[in-house]
């Protein structure tokens, strides 16, 4: 079953739209799939993630998620859609420096006004799953790179999203921690979560079901 489709999307920047980030780009992702998006720096990978997450919008094309036309959503409606359906994992973790790990993980639930008892239950549950229970009272600066990324993943999945968008999630990690993060993604995928992983690492892409290539904002091939 198809979870999302981005069809013929284009995105231009600059006063006269002279910078092309996406040019008639399309991607379809099946529910329960783990897909890699590969391309060089500046090829448009992050723009694809920003459009799918609703952080940005395309100038043309259509975007459907779960059979619903998301292209029409704006403002608060798009924010609510993102909070309900999508978790985001960044290369450099994007944790709040002055919040301990418990509060970083709990942040999406607090924004959704979930009660304190349920927040505590869910944070401790996901922390146990990712082996970071002992880190919950630590600040991000006290963590290793691998630990920080596991906290970021915990925050991304705490709202039980249908889709995880991961932007170079192993790019700042050593080989051992990269392998551990990919094992976590595999487990999440096996539990039913769909993942789209932006990467430049062929080893990461090899662990995904499919790889979509992007070059100069355009589709440049697919590997299975």
Task: Give residue spans per PLM region.
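ABC family nucleotide-binding domain
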Residues: 3-4, 9-214
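H-loop (His-switch) and adjacent beta-strand-loop-beta switch element
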Residues: 211-224
């Amino acid at each position: 079953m198809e979870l999302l489709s981005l069809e013929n999307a284009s995105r231009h920047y600059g006063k006269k739209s002279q910078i092309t980030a996406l040019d008639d780009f399309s991607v379809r992702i099946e529910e329960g799939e783990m897909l890699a998006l590969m391309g060089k720096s500046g090829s448009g990978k992050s723009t694809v993630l920003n459009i799918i997450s609703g952080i940005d919008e395309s100038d043309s094309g259509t975007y459907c998620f779960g059979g619903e036309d998301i292209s029409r959503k704006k403002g608060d409606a798009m924010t609510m859609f993102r909070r309900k359906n999508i978790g985001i994992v960044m290369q450099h973790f994007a944790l709040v420096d002055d919040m301990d790990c418990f509060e970083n993980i709990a942040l999406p639930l607090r924004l959704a006004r979930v009660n304190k008892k349920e927040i505590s239950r869910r944070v401790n549950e996901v922390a146990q799953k990712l082996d970071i229970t002992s880190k919950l009272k630590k600040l991000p600066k006290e963590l290793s790179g691998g630990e920080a990324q596991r906290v970021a993943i915990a925050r991304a999945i705490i709202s039980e999203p249908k889709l995880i968008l991961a932007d170079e999630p192993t790019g700042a990690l050593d080989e051992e921690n990269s392998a551990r993060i990919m094992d976590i993604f595999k487990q999440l995928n096996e539990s039913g979560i769909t993942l789209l992983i932006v990467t430049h690492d062929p080893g990461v892409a090899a662990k995904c079901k499919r790889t979509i290539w992007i070059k100069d904002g355009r589709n440049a091939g697919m590997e299975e």
